[in-house]
């Protein structure tokens, strides 16, 4: 397992050219070369990870192997015993016979990525909800309404491509908001790091 502080020490801008071996992150780690892999700066995963770990979107060391192709990242981590990388859960799930997921300790003990831990909010701060926004004028079109209804009533389908489905209660609330024509977002244009699905539902209930 690793702590959030250790991830920050490894990935923060100040680590570039300075933190190059595992034991520099934690003396208990081996004195081996640190090999890092991650998405490029145009990736939403990059933005969220740097916001969650380093406190500012796009704030990251630059001396790591970056790629917009998650399969390239998977191959890089898989082929190097001293490598660590971050990418979407879907790519870990598709290759979990070759990769090891690192449990993250955010102060309450190590927690591994899983549907249960993401849903109950314990896998923080490295889990996030994904959103679909519909233009008000488009929401009046029958085919758009049918698509949104299908998406929200068949949420379990996302599991087939490695994503984690929302609880049915969250889907029901989103569908009610859509039917009622409620506009806007509870985030005010800024990312919310570490928010749980339960907290998100409470906020959206106030829209």
Question: Where are the language model's segments positioned?
Answer:
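Flexible loop/hinge segments at secondary-structure junctions
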Residues: 1-207
